[in-house]
């Protein structure tokens, strides 16, 4: 039970140190690229950029990505590589999907194996998985240059080239081969028609003949490596990494977890190497690892070591819940639907789990995928025991426990600035970070970056929980329904992309005659949250780093607060927990905590 999480974290930690040094070597331009690659890189180099030029280049690149992505999805039915004749998604779903993949969120209000063609998967999804992940990486590199007082922030286009070509593509190729060898398909063929062993298992046609089974396939192995290396998370299949074609065996599950964690951990090492301050980086590394281990242990304890009370503890009970689409505005449900069955739960809560990965793999994966804002899932998060469901939410609320590709480290730097400021106030000294004074401008930028995240989660959650837009979309009553709404906006704001998936938020094709009634509301609301929560928290830290870069170094004295010792580690940990986590405590109490303590095992 504990072997898998320990093996994953130990292996990743060991690999992160040499790989982090390699990434620093790349981003500092100390490598010797082959001639033709160097020629392309030189063409992309438009010269050194200050922070405003860097941000403008970043926004222009993302604007072009949005336009191209929107065009591809709108024209999907007319484009090649569409053997299964996929149609055109609704306009709001296209907006949500393009925004989602452009911002590295990969929130999916559609099912990849049912709604997208191979061309869309390769030309839109795969492309954005590389570039959106690289954007966060580039932002971190630019901030590091500002913190070490370089004369410029670098060049965005040159940084993008370095990240994609020298970091992502080589590792993706190696991982792709390993995953294909383990059973992931790689083909541009359409669905395979097979005859089932049990005649009529797929139903019968009007003429009485048994229906064949249609198995979706495609270029899965091309997408899966960068899906996890880039902490993207969007699945080729609707079941995501629980699907046997995305995640065939326990070995592929281990590789997947390694892929998710390796870059976020290595970027902390890169931070220390580029700043020439490994002691400070190790304090950050240790704090993040401590928080991650706490999340993983909590998740496993409350899910794998505790049975699902909804299966055995209570008999069936009938409830009337609000549903604007039902006659009279109410619908009747039995909750829990399978209560009272003689189910053996010695292995813990097995609802929504794939046992081919091992008993603790679902809870472990849930902690990993939300700690680093990946969003890929190998179990149904909606089926986690209530207190175990707090783990993925906490990872998204903090958004810095390793965090996404570069952006997690950027978020931790914001907490660092706030922590230094609070510590300086407590001892009566002007706060300093890396020898630079932290003053009013830096604190305003830090607080803007910090507060936009809870605002974008709690505000829309309260709005949708109060309106039919939210209540009419949940498939569960009470606290669990509230948790579904809270999780969706937490995922959108954290650029995570996973979901409790009990929401009716899928419209489907534009000509769908029976879409989820409030799906356009969810498409637009989460799309706007993703945009705001992506760009404000990465632009303001760039401005903050540029502000610090313009200041003179102050000499180190006996009264200077050190940022490379255990004491500062506790200051940083306290800042993250007090400033970050406590903001969401009331929402957690209304959702998963109330569900755990309530009269019903689920959805009381």
Regions from the language model: what does each represent?
Residues 19-30, 71-84, 147-150, 178-192, ...:
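Juxtamembrane/interface segments at transmembrane-helix termini
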Residues 152, 270-279, 425-439, 543-564:
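Alpha-helical transmembrane segments
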Residues 1-97, 102, 117, 121, ...:
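N-terminal alpha-helical transmembrane segments of multi-pass membrane transport
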Residues 56-66, 128-139, 256-268, 408-422, ...:
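Hydrophobic alpha-helical transmembrane segments
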């Amino acid at each position: 039970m504990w072997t898998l999480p320990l093996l994953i974290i130990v292996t990743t930690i060991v690999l992160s140190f040499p790989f982090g040094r390699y990434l620093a070597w790349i981003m500092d331009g100390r490598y010797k690229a082959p001639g033709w690659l160097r020629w392309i890189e030189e063409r992309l180099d438009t010269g050194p950029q200050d922070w405003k030029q860097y941000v403008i280049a970043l926004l222009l690149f993302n604007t072009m990505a949005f336009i191209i992505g929107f065009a591809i999805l709108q024209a999907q039915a007319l484009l090649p590589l569409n053997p299964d004749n996929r149609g055109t998604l609704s306009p709001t779903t296209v907006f949500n999907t393009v925004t989602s993949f452009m911002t590295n969120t990969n929130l999916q209000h559609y099912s990849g194996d049912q709604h997208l063609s191979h061309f869309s998967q390769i030309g839109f999804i795969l492309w954005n998985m590389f570039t959106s992940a690289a954007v966060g990486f580039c932002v971190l590199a630019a901030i590091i240059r500002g913190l070490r007082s370089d004369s410029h922030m670098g060049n965005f286009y040159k940084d993008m080239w370095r990240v994609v070509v020298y970091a992502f593509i080589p590792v993706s190729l190696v991982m792709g081969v390993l995953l294909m060898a383990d059973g992931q398909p790689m083909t541009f063929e359409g669905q395979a028609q097979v005859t089932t062993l049990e005649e009529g298992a797929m139903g019968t046609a009007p003429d009485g003949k048994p229906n064949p089974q249609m198995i979706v396939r495609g270029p899965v192995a091309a997408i899966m490596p960068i899906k996890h290396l880039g902490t993207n998370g969007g699945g080729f299949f609707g079941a995501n990494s629980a699907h046997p074609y995305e995640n065939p065996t326990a070995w592929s599950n281990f590789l997947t977890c390694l892929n998710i964690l390796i870059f976020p951990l290595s970027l902390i090492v890169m931070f220390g190497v580029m700043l020439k301050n490994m002691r400070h980086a190790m304090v950050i590394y240790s704090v993040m690892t401590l928080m991650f281990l706490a999340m993983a242990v909590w998740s496993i304890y409350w899910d794998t070591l505790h049975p699902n009370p909804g299966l055995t503890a209570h008999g069936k009970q009938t409830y009337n819940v609000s549903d604007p689409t039902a006659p009279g505005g109410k619908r009747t449900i039995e909750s829990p639907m399978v209560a009272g069955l003689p189910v053996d739960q010695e292995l813990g809560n097995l609802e929504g789990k794939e046992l081919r990965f091992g008993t603790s793999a679902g809870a472990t994966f849930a902690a990993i995928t939300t700690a680093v804002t990946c969003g890929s899932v190998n179990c149904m998060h909606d089926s986690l025991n209530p207190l175990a469901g707090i783990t993925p939410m906490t990872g998204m609320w903090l958004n810095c426990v390793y965090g996404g590709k570069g952006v997690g480290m950027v978020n931790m730097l914001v907490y660092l600035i706030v922590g230094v400021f609070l510590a300086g106030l407590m001892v009566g000294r002007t706060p300093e970070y890396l020898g630079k004074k932290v003053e009013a401008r830096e604190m305003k930028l830090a607080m803007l970056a910090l507060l936009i995240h809870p605002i974008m989660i709690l505000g829309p959650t309260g709005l949708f929980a109060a309106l039919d837009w939210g209540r009419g979309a949940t498939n569960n009553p009470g606290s669990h329904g509230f948790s579904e709404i809270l999780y969706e906006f937490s995922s959108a704001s954290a650029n995570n992309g996973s979901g409790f998936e009990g929401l009716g938020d899928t419209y489907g094709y534009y000509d769908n005659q029976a879409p989820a009634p409030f799906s356009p509301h969810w498409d637009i609301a989460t799309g706007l949250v993703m945009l705001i929560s992506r760009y404000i928290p990465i632009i303001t830290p760039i401005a903050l780093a540029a502000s610090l870069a313009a200041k003179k170094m102050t000499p180190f004295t006996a009264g200077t607060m050190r940022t490379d010792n255990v004491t500062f580690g506790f200051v940083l940990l306290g800042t993250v927990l007090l400033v970050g986590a406590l903001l969401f405590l009331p929402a957690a109490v209304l959702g998963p905590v109330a569900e755990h303590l309530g009269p019903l095992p689920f959805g009381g």
